[in-house]
């Protein structure tokens, strides 16, 4: 009797899996998954997690065209088989009952009407109306009248296609990602200090550090997998310590050896105190400083990123200035000398002994320190400053760019690094850290994209907060939102957000898988494929680029953001978007569409369908007739290769669990700027911060300056917003997972028991929380995971039934243009 091939394969794979399991050996070649697939009918394949910037890898199980299970990928170096609670329920995020499956257009009596009701339409009709509105705006006001708001959740090639469409096609820099709300201050900190973006260290530092310091980061809930690695080191490595700083006590404090609750905005003063402590105790690494660091100070009194007519902007001496001035070490030492332990303790509310204990961790030359931060630093009206102040401390002692010594900026979105930052989807950026303001950068980009000289505008476009202001003012008229829920996420929504969306001069398109606050404010809704319904790539917080295959098809007529971008480009001739002056420089483009010039250009369309993976769908490639993702990736990768942003070949990423760039000669880079790790550091130099032409990093002195809005007699509490473990961002995915919704069904206002008592409030009681911009009903919570100090309340923003961003202030860091969601004044009253 002959055993069938499938049966023989099953027996062989099962035996291998059993043997490996008994020995504790993971099977990297997929043999165990093969055995499980044969026995259950489930196919397993890898993908990057859809949620945060940690970049966990998961195994996706599909059966009969549906994702039926996910599990942690045991071969993934990031998460080593673990998931957080959100990751374990990934299989359910695509199957909410209200999934969008057809384009919806506001209509009355069968024609588009801004005040009409949503009706299903075909893709052709949707794009016909949308293209007409964009053409009308371009004809009337030019390229600055059109814009796009994108995402750190776009795949790498979606972000690249969007940036190319806007900057090369429509000649508008009015494209910005929602990463402006979360990572822009980190970017400015990197660029000013090092001349190049993204962390120099990697997750391996969690196993090498002696001390971990969290600044404005609740890793226990927001980066739980990384927290598990940190926790493992703390519990197994003798002498290791955890220090946590925040404006309220959260779950990360449970592991803290030194937990510090400080007054909002005073992190600026604390960091200057640490620098002063290092200098005054004689622990400056003078050799490192003399070889590798220049010292500067920044312009001060720079305003708060508010409208120009706002009183605080009018009063600023140097509004929006990022000017740096060289200073001597003695001048720097004198500047930080005023930040004594007594002064900073009084200002911040942190006991002096705790501040000294913290400062000693950095000063002690025998301790390796990993500093970690995220939104508490970045969503800050001095976010760019506070990022640089963090680097100042590490540079003073030379604790940087080596295992365990790592100032590490954590990211919140799965590809805020890989797409928003590296691709250049910000209003001022181009691929590989280039910027539109630089003539040489624009010229290089135009050459690579085969564009006439002068195609890309030299002036930065409208950033996220400015986009809302320009929509409201009627200067931005045709607007496309993809892969975010900005009407729930953006600040001061009532005054600056919603009016622009409903301005009768404007046409708003929103692409999303689900109905959201943003889609319901739009004129046209486009149904979007999500996660493994398309082939994708993300770049995580440690510079790791990861790919996945399309696993299942999107429901109904839903299409990926990439398909939408490329298909929409076919609706415009080059004559309609460029004009005669540019066309005269490249007459060979006459008569072509934007699609022909940007995508069917001999580069993007050079890889045949035969190169796509056998056994997997690839809907975009099948539609356009070539391997779209590979073409876009290889064209994009050409910007960074040889320029310290090297990416590996396309196929390499499908065969691996990701690589950390720069990838040179097939080798990833764990530590940048350090000889022996980074191929861009010449032999014999030891350390070279090559982002700056002189190879040196910058210490940037900046003082403490207060927040723009502080509690007073009427609005007597600080309002801080943020996230919780169970939900991600606006909850548009996680609230459709029944288990996650039940675990945390509604937002609450976390309040100190004494503050509640003083207002006659009890736990669970309905209250009204208000600011100068609006009010909202909620319920008071005086217990639970978040223990706030007196004078401050914390409110999560995931709940579309409680739009807390009606209340927040649209103040930003004037340099990064990132919103401060952590500090404004509010009051709480009985409802």
UniProtKB/Swiss-Prot annotation:
Cofactor note: Binds 1 [4Fe-4S] cluster.
Gene3D superfamilies recorded: 2.40.40.20, 3.30.200.210, 3.40.50.740, Dimethylsulfoxide Reductase, domain 2 (3.40.228.10)
Cleaved signal peptide residues: 1-35
Pfam families for the chain: Molybdop_Fe4S4, Molybdopterin, Molydop_binding
Main subcellular location: periplasm
UniProt-listed Enzyme Commission number(s): 1.9.6.1
Domain of life: Bacteria
Modification after translation (UniProt): Predicted to be exported by the Tat system. The position of the signal peptide cleavage has not been experimentally proven.
Reactions that this protein is recorded to catalyse: 2 Fe(II)-[cytochrome] + nitrate + 2 H(+) = 2 Fe(III)-[cytochrome] + nitrite + H2O
Amino acids binding Mo-bis(molybdopterin guanine dinucleotide): 86, 153, 178, 182, 215-222, 246-250, 265-267, 375, 379, 485, 511-512, 534, 561, 721-730, 805, 822
The keyword Coiled coil appears for this protein: no
Cofactors, names only: [4Fe-4S] cluster; Mo-bis(molybdopterin guanine dinucleotide)
Domain 4Fe-4S Mo/W bis-MGD-type, chain residue ranges per copy: 42-98
Binding sites annotated in the UniProt record for substrate: 797
Localization annotation: Periplasm
Enzyme class: oxidoreductase
GO cellular component: membrane; nitrate reductase complex; periplasmic space
Family: Belongs to the prokaryotic molybdopterin-containing oxidoreductase family. NasA/NapA/NarB subfamily.
Function of the protein: Catalytic subunit of the periplasmic nitrate reductase complex NapAB. Receives electrons from NapB and catalyzes the reduction of nitrate to nitrite.
Quaternary structure and interacting proteins, as annotated: Component of the periplasmic nitrate reductase NapAB complex composed of NapA and NapB.
Name assigned to this protein: Periplasmic nitrate reductase
Gene: napA
